[in-house]
Amino acid sequence: MRQDVANMFNQNAPAPSFEAIRISIASPEKIRSWSSGEIKKPETINYRTFKPERDGLFCARIFGPTKDYECLCGKYKRIKYRGIVCEKCGVEVTLARVRRERMGHIDLAAPVAHIWFLKSLPSRISTLVDMPLKDVERVLYFESYVVIEPGLTELEPLQLLTEEEYMDAQDRLGEDAFTALIGAEAIREILKSLDLPTLAETLREELRESSSELKTKKYSKRLKVVDSFIQSKAKPEWMILTVVPVIPPDLRPLVPLDGGRFATSDLNDLYRRVINRNNRLKRLMELRAPDIIIRNEKRMLQESVDALFDNGRRGRTITGTNKRPLKSISDMLKGKQGRFRQNLLGKRVDYSGRSVIVVGPNLKLHECGLPKKMALELFKPFIYARLDAKGLAGTVKAAKKLVEKEKPEVWDILDEVIREHPVLLNRAPTLHRLGIQAFEPKLIEGKAIQLHPLVCAAFNADFDGDQMAVHVPLSLEAQLECRVLMMSTNNILSPANGKPIIVPSQDIILGLYYLSLDRKGEIGEGMVFADLAEIEHALDAGLVSLHSKVRALYDGVDSDGKPERRIIDTTPGRYMVANILPRSKAIGPELVNTVLSKKAIGKIIDEVYRLCGQKATVIFCDKMMELGFREACKAGISFGKDDMVIPEAKKRLVDATKDLVSDYERQYADGLITRGEKYNKVVDAWSSCTDKVADAMMESAAKMQVSRGKEQVNSIFMMADSGARGSKNQMKQLAGMRGLMAKPSGEIIETPIISNFKEGLTVLEYFNSTHGARKGLADTALKTANSGYLTRRLVDVAQDCIINEDDCGTEKGIDINAVMEGADVVVSLNERILGRVIAEDIKGPDGKLVVPANTYVDEDVAALIDTATVDRVKVRSPLTCETKNGICAQCYGRDLARGTLVNRGEAVGVIAAQSIGEPGTQLTMRTFHIGGAAQVADQSSLEASFEGTVRFTDAEIVTRKDKTIVVVGRRMQVEIVDADGRTRQSFRPAYGTRLMAKDGDKVMPGKLLADWDPFAQPIVSEVAGEARFIDLSEGTTVREETDEATGISARVVVDPRSTSKTADLKPSIQIVDASGKPVKLPNGSPATYVLSVGAILSVSDGDRIEPGDTLSRVATGGAKTKDITGGLPRVAELFEARRPKDHAIIAEVDGRVEYGRDYKNKRKVTIVPTEEGREPIDYLVPKGKHLAVQDGDFIKRGEYLMDGNPAPQDILSTLGVEALANYLTDEVQKVYRLQGVPINDKHIEVIVRQMLQKVEITDGGDTVFITGEHIDAIEFDEANEAIRKSRKKDQREATANPLLLGITKASLQTRSFISAASFQETTRVLTEAAIQGKIDTLDGLKENVIVGRLIPAGTGGGIRQFRRVAAERDLKLKAKRAAAMAKAEEGINLVSLPAPERDTAE
């Protein structure tokens, strides 16, 4: 009894536990079974008594009482009458809460189509009945009749008849000869008459036989819908409603405002319309009204139900009183303000405060300063409880009074409450997980929150008025998670790249940098000191300076961990820094015996963390911060205008460049170069001049300056060099020259800004520089929104990527090598494999095993691999992981934020998305490089960086008369090999490059290897002979273009005006011998060089040609016309897998190139495969584009026919998954590297994995799949596995190609419909899911947040696993018990039963 009473008051009964959610179409019976009664009247409440009207939209009889345990007429009040139905008003006496749960229904007088299935594209109704959507609408909205049963007449089934045609047919053929209906009834009849299993069979037959692509598409689309209905056991006629459900009244409330007016949910208006029209239709039908009136009423009913479900989807939007469109049920779910994103994913949190932040340099790393007033408010409940426990207040009211009066004992209790109770601090926008961290509060006076300076980088906070929010974790579990997982001391490394994120910046760096400088000839040089106190004494006495080279005794630890004292060479400043290092055998004072810039300090913290652990690191960081601030303050570094030193060399350099530019102008005037080439050369000259001036400036700034008889380091140089503030680029603009600027369109303006800010800009220069500045401001505003949207899409696509097992056992992996740009190593192999797991044994050059497979690469293993001189390593990768749901720990490798192998349950998908999205705001929005000041400096030559021997591979070269070598192939590789046979440097010379070294030459570093014209692509003759022009005739294919500025003419190949005569013209140059026969090339084809449109001829008809002579050249437009989509748009383009505008054409097979005929503005290029029995492949190339290959060239699979950015889909289809992953990783990394943002490759790999989850069926075999269907790779593998296991004869497996989906598409096609619906296109996703009867197994994070559970990652994953085990154990026990009972009942001797356990699964 007592339990019952307790249950009665405990309104939060345990929620039913469930494993999955299914969505399907509701049948009319189902809708009626949910309902508690039919709503017959459109009235809501009585406006006098405020009581709901009977049978109306708020009827208490149907939906339940408005007050707890009280019927409407007031006959039964109190809980004792619970469950009684009042005989007077018919209301059940129960909780008013049931008004949120009970549904009603409206019985429609005529069936209506559900607008989601009708208008959500592709329309499911029209697909099933096999009529165009327009026709279906004409039938539904009573414009045409549709023939359902033609009988013996000449009418076709599903033929549309207008009113007149229908009447006419009835007159002609008799009324009963055929059946034709109109409206939703007609469509319902057609859907009802469908026999789905037979239809599916027929469609499968037709699919097998169909030859045309269009039909195949149509059949497979229809078959998909039919299959969905068969699978989900739904009947197609349920898409036509005969009953409309009414949602509970408390979910569409009516609220009285003051002044006798009411605020109501729009849904009530929409329901009212439906009921009004429905009742009117019923009345008209009873009155036997004329057909036309009834039809109009039915159409209006259809429209009102449409508006209720999705207002504005079809026809006019229904508006309310103030011309505002009414919010329909669909609008309640859609968009940022919809149910999903507003209430289910974005909940507000209780117990929080926010205030401005100020710096707290005296805090420890794990502390934050919390204003007393704020703490008092936040911790109120705890204070009340403590006051009560101490007997200082008997009731809550008394406690409240005490707190309000702020009595002294209240403050004491607040101190107790706060001790060891962490709080969460959050700064918006929270772009990555470090945007929320836990701290222990320290009570402070004042009203601002104090923040530790070192965590600013993680929060991206500064103290110019930023605000932060404080949240209080209430439950014990929450406090535990805060302390163990979210404490700022546990987040030392950044999850994006594994480097420390608690790195000092600005003043601290400047102080440490100043401390660590050393100079010759300072006062007190060579002195010896015993300890720190002695040094400080000497410094105070002025006997020694911070930068003097001295020797001192250092108390360290030897290799066995015993304390030892030794003398070290140092400076007083560096000794201070060494003194705060943790004492450990792995770390000595040598670590800080260098100039401490930001990078160096980051490295030191990293080392300390790895070798001495977390606690030592935190203590070290705090000490370092204190030391840095103190010394920066003491040093008193400041700068004035004289610190900006303009280099003497500037005038000389600028004058020299001016001469060079006027020289180019002269060449242009003489017609030696084209306008584009001149532009390129000028821009090039100025950008190298700017760099030289900058170098000269840095050199002069780095020198000591003598001021007031003392040598001083330049303060600005110190700030920039240490990384405290400013950069070389900014210094260049202050004291060098500002350099080239860009127009808003992205082109570079030829005239640079020669002045710097110290000299001041001229009016014209200032005007030129405003472009960049203005564009920068406009960009910043757009950037934030774009970057946020990219992050959202990334999180959405990767949210269900969780570490679910320890090892999937795969042997696959991807190859990794160092990233090179030209001859420079940008990212070493060492850095790239750190924290990965090796996939196959690594052997050294001598074949000895260096590292076995499945080794986890930590710093030591990486160093080992580095010494073994291997240049590529195969590592496990998320891309090749074979775990079913999620990724395994071995394939993922190191958890970057902890520096150890990743734990199970880590949400690596979200971490990847945040790591890529968080720096998004730092990327540019530009389609060109760096801000206003443009940088071009196109390489035009290459020098050797190492000593070694030159080696040519795939050499295709000709030697000219002057003994220079010209490259005439596209696959040639030039390498420099050292004495051990290791390749130290390699590059692919472009076609037309001049090589300065021969195969086998010995070279020294700095030797010029090659040079080329970066601004023109030449065509070079490989043989000697005479030039003969083919189809090159003045006026049709060649035009003399006279330059207005110079009067010099050049002959340019133009596109002939297309007429039948000129259609087959192929402008080309042939090399012929003395007898007039074409000379043969080495590969046996005649020496004919086809010219593309825009080529400038360099020879005349009949000229004598030597090998290596340039026949023509194509200017490659302004500084790189290849649209450099940079920054954010490029990252988005890559992740969305969009085809670039002028994408490269990739050869799909090895073969010989043949030029085909020309079409209007395309040219046909064919590759004839070398493989036997393969069909030649044709490509259509735009005419004006320069082709990378000549007629007759041999091309390998994956090489480019036409240059440009390749389309990722092409890479996937020709070169496979690994090549695609490498391409995407490299391209994304290029964008981030340009901004100096380090991101680990594995994050990009996780996202790419999510983009590659689907396959496209190429042949269904004997599975249920349809050709052309997109399905999950996992489902595909399972289906094939089933066929393999069935072992039936001649059963074929399905085949498929991997499919690359952009992140938006991939999110919308995830297995979880709840997650997809909450992302975008809510209605479409739900419609699709309902038809398929989809089941959401709640695997991802989003789905679980939406249904209100713990997420299956981190601690939530552990609890989930625990519950699962418990439930399985319970089931076994129950089964055991049941078996024992059964045995007992049979009369066999009774077995002792296991004691009943409590159901632990709940």
UniProtKB/Swiss-Prot annotation:
It comes from the Bacteria. Its EC number is 2.7.7.6. This is DNA-directed RNA polymerase subunit beta'. NCBIfam families: rpoC_TIGR. Belongs to the RNA polymerase beta' chain family. Zn(2+) 2 binds at C808, C881, C888, C891. One of its GO terms (cellular component) is DNA-directed RNA polymerase complex. It comes from Hyphomonas neptunium (strain ATCC 15444). Mg(2+) binds at D462, D464, D466. The gene is rpoC. Zn(2+) 1 binds at C71, C73, C86, C89. InterPro entries: DNA-dir_RpoC_beta_prime, DNA-dir_RpoC_beta_prime_bact, RNA_pol_asu, RNA_pol_N, RNA_pol_Rpb1_1, RNA_pol_Rpb1_3, RNA_pol_Rpb1_3_sf, RNA_pol_Rpb1_4. Gene3D superfamilies: 1.10.132.30, 1.10.150.390, 1.10.1790.20, 1.10.40.90, 2.40.40.20, 2.40.50.100, RNA polymerase II, clamp domain, RNA polymerase Rpb1, domain 3. The keyword Acyltransferase does not apply. DNA-dependent RNA polymerase catalyzes the transcription of DNA into RNA using the four ribonucleoside triphosphates as substrates. Its cofactor is Mg(2+); Zn(2+). Coiled coil: none annotated. Pfam families: RNA_pol_Rpb1_1, RNA_pol_Rpb1_2, RNA_pol_Rpb1_3, RNA_pol_Rpb1_4, RNA_pol_Rpb1_5. The RNAP catalytic core consists of 2 alpha, 1 beta, 1 beta' and 1 omega subunit. When a sigma factor is associated with the core the holoenzyme is formed, which can initiate transcription. Keywords: DNA-directed RNA polymerase, Magnesium, Metal-binding, Nucleotidyltransferase, Transcription, Transferase, Zinc. PANTHER family: DNA-DIRECTED RNA POLYMERASE, DNA-DIRECTED RNA POLYMERASE SUBUNIT BETA. One of its GO terms (molecular function) is zinc ion binding. Binds 1 Mg(2+) ion per subunit. Binds 2 Zn(2+) ions per subunit. One of its GO terms (biological process) is DNA-templated transcription.
